Amino acid sequence: SGINPGANVGRSVYHSGTIGACLTARNGGITGVAVSQAVDEGGYMGQGIEEMLRNQKWDSAAEIAALAVGEMCTNLPKEASVLNINVPNMDVSEMKGWAQTTVGTDLMRQMTEVDIEPKIGHEGAYHLNLKWGERITPSSIDNDVGAVANGYVSISWLSRLISQEPPSGSSVESRLDSIFTD
């Protein structure tokens, strides 16, 4: 899936359609590869818009994608998997290398302002405007955000969404018991 304009790193992994397509494939027993490329211009991280894409180095992302997908097809993993690849927006010759990464929690830009405006004609609905500040460059390349921000291709294998034990203090279960218990 991809090449997606805008890095799918950190928090954006959770709402990425590019990654969602690969997760869906894995649910059907098919290995998926999501490829995304950082967008350097504009005021926010994530999905780029038309005017932000004029200086994209698509050939670089395509070269990395072709190499990874070709190898994946030659040597498929034994079980259906999802590989998330994020490529910096630069020539391959300028990249520092690649890094095996975890999904980060850092942002690539600070959020400076959030405006909430009522949506005219839609009672109870609002339009949310996010304004992003200066670019942040995390020092660690151990996570996907830091790797891409520092000029490395990020390679992350994504796991399934799995359930967990209820968090301490959760009362949802006992509340549900109250309506289903005689």
Regions found by a protein language model. Give the residues of each.
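Short acidic, glycine-rich surface-loop motifs adjacent to enzyme active sites
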Residues: 1-6
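Glycine/threonine-rich flexible loop motifs
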Residues: 7-16
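Acidic, metal/ion-coordinating pockets
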Residues: 21-24
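Glycine-rich phosphate/pyrophosphate-binding loops
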Residues: 26-48
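Secondary-structure boundary elements
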Residues: 26-33, 70-78
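Glycine- and Gly-Pro-enriched alpha-helical subdomains that act as flexible
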Residues: 47, 64-68
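Active-site-proximal region of nucleotide-activated glycan assembly enzymes
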Residues: 56-63
